[in-house]
Swiss-Prot record:
Organism per entry: Stenotrophomonas maltophilia (strain K279a)
Binding site for a divalent metal cation: 8-9, 40, 92
Protein's UniProt name: 5'-nucleotidase SurE
Primary localization: cytoplasm
Cofactor(s) of this protein: a divalent metal cation
Subcellular location: Cytoplasm
Recorded GO MF terms: 3'-nucleotidase activity; 5'-nucleotidase activity; exopolyphosphatase activity; metal ion binding; nucleotide binding
UniProt function note: Nucleotidase that shows phosphatase activity on nucleoside 5'-monophosphates.
Length: 259
């Protein structure tokens, strides 16, 4: 298969290098289009106010001064001379579990591929303190999942969010299909002063696990399993439609009132 690989940790990150290498060893034609530096937490942001510069590192690798979404968007709307068969994003050097997917550049790169009509997979290694031991395990999981997608495609609106425990391949307990869990509210921001006495702030850590029982992505990786969560872009809260619809009459009546 022709595979577009991207990430949010940057084009030189160990995870993306391992992913591209193992996919090539499996016989795939891999092109890497990735940010020129770490863009973790970039979510789905597109650069619209500046031109996007890039550097062609070699025939198969492009470094982009932009977000993960920029990378995939450019690749699929004009940069590449061919249409890939699938987008694989990763390997992220940290978990993307539960609410993390809203902020994740790794997941957003895959999501942009899905927006533009391609199957898409986001792969993350659940590391401790960003100290990865077994990127090869996550890469092998990606190879297996790509093979399965080729043989048995999913519906067109589906993205796979894959989280892999940081274990040797032979210590992984198996694969589990999961739903997204969620976290408690994020911890507070961290206030500091710069050398000139001006206030500066750092975003605080993500909240601790809250909804993390059996069936969730949190539980799967905690018990040594590879979590596969099918996700989609439709953010509609269908359970609230009827309640909100009950307001509409009153809201519409306000249109008849004087301004």
């Amino acid at each position: 298969m022709r595979i577009l690989v991207s990430n949010d940790d940057g084009v030189d990150a160990a995870g993306i290098r391992m992913l591209a290498s193992v996919l090539r060893e499996a016989g795939h034609e891999v092109t890497v289009v990735a940010p020129d530096r770490d863009r973790s937490g970039a979510s789905n942001s597109l650069t619209l106010d500046l031109p996007i510069r890039l550097k062609r590192i070699d025939h198969y690798t492009v470094s982009v001064a932009g977000t993960p979404t920029d990378c995939v968007h450019l690749a699929l709307t004009g940069l590449l001379e061919f249409e890939p068969d699938i987008v694989v994003s990763g390997i992220n050097n940290a978990a993307n579990l539960g609410d993390d997917v809203i902020y994740s550049g790794t997941v957003s790169a895959a999501m942009e591929g899905r927006f533009l009509g391609l199957p898409a997979v986001a792969v993350s290694l659940v590391t401790r303190n960003h100290d990865p031991k077994h990127f090869e395990t996550a890469a092998r999981a990606a190879v297996e999942i790509v093979a399965r997608l080729k043989a048995d495609p999913l519906p067109a609106d589906t993205i796979l969010n894959v989280n892999v425990p940081d274990l040797p391949w032979n210590e992984v307990k198996g694969f589990e299909v999961t739903r997204l869990g969620n976290r408690h509210r994020a911890e507070g921001c961290i206030a500091q002063k710069d050398p000139r006495g001006n206030e500066v702030y750092w975003i605080g850590p993500a909240g601790r696990e809250q909804d993390s029982g059996p069936g969730t992505d949190f539980h799967a990786v905690r018990t040594g399993h590879i979590s596969i969560t099918p996700i989609q872009v439709d953010l509609t809260r269908y359970q609230a439609l009827e309640k909100v619809a009950s307001w509409v009459g009153g809201l519409s009546a306000a249109l008849d009132q004087p301004a």
